[in-house]
Amino acid sequence: MGSCYETRADKTKFIIDEDYKIKRALVRAIQNYTIYKKAQQIQEINDQPDENHVPKRGSVLPFPLTNSGGYEKIISKNKGVLEEEYQILRPLAEGGYGQVYLVKHLKIQKERAMKVIPIKSKNADEKTDEEIELLKNLDHPNIVKLFEYFCDDEKYYLITEYCDGGDLFNLIRNKRVFSESSAAYIMYQIFRALIYCHYTHHLIHRDIKPENIVVYRQNKAGEDLYDVKLIDFGISKIFNKLEKNNDSKIRGSLNYIAPEVLQNNFNEKCDIWSCGVILYILVIGTYPFNGKDKDDILNKIQHGSYTFPSEFTKKASAEIRNLIHQCLKVNPDERISAKDALNHPFFNLYETKEYFIHVTEAFLNKTINNLKKYEIKNNLQELTFQYIVHNSPEIEEINLLNRVFSKFNQNNDGKMTKEELKKGLMKYLFKGKKNKAAAEKEANEIFNKLDQNNNGYIECEEFVRAGIDKKLLKDRKVLEFTFNFLDKDRNGEISYEELKEVFDVKNIENEKALLDLLKSIDNDLNGQISFEEYYNMMLKIIDGLI
């Protein structure tokens, strides 16, 4: 009796018969034999000391989770069928790059934004690949996250975080003019994101404008305070201060473009010019460089020709006028940097930083306790926590943990050093020089646990996944979602080859460690990890951390 098919509602359902079950069992047996044969071949590694192998400081993982501290392992091309995993709800925006849609993840019922980019040429294809690789390495609370992407012969489909407050352009259109305190809160976040881009990744965004700043919520500290995130790195560029940065064509949006970009010789300061334009618009309600036509506008931009309305000058603070002037200096060498902008007196007028990083002392203590208790049992646990945290920005506790991270990361570069951690503990918890030794001891212990990739600092998501209340990670649907990511062929089980692909294991020592990991979870010894085996393993680990 052979296998047969039947069609129901345009979907093919495979009817498994006895012959198929026998064939499947035979294939499984061959797979298992291959896996365990490989284990025998590399078992000798345990018996021979490796003189060149030096265990990494603070790491209990048998092989590195990531190669460079980025998120290559959890942000990947989804090889499944887009329509089977996402429901397209409605269009959100359209531009020269393509379209953006609101979509819903069918398994976890969470809304996402989907950016659809046509593949028009080989050059466009390579540019999209560059954008994806770039987004994989960006980890900042004020930059929208990339979750995964699909690709076919005609288009890329980038699945990103969805912020339901719309973009800043629409908010400006509805409000017309913002108070200085509200403008300060918005600009504080944009400058923080740019410090991270400019100093940590040597990255110029090149298209800072209200349409590329999205609102993800109103801050509870005040009804006129909006939490925002930066989007669209499609024309961004890595820069080198020692080299001339130029482009074959002028890119950016007319009203926000810096004069040096028009001369095709620019650096990261072109983003600061755009910020000056946005700040002007927020508090005045019009563009600083208006004109009767495009040439008139470009002429005013090149000469930095703008004025403040008399009504604004009468009521505006000297600090905001000065910051706008500092951002709109024609000479980029004289223009303020993102770091200096964030330290400008304007932001001290309204306690902007205090609003942005505010959390209760009880939450701060709870976070530190979670950090101290954090323990990594195996790579699969760490990858699971990383995947859940990265894909769940809507969880309120994650937002609060981002604030705690910002409290400690004083230079706002998105990389918490051991010294910053120690100073933060001293300032917010130990509160006194007599406790310096205790703060240093605690900072060392926490830092060595969290810096698993040994790059010398703690990134935001490393901090969040260690500090989060682990009860939030026990949800069966959330763990099913993560299991589905690991189960690349969607057959309901995780194989050795799938783990090898996820962890990018390429040497024989790491293959042995990976095989040991699989065998420690594979209770029925079938060479695969079922969801129940994975789920029970994760529950046991999470319960031990609560």
Regions found by a protein language model. Name each.
Residues 111, 116-138:
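Conserved N-lobe beta3->alphaC-helix segment of eukaryotic protein kinase catalytic domains
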Residues 385-386, 416-432, 459-470, 495-507, ...:
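Amphipathic regulatory helices of Ca2+-sensor modules
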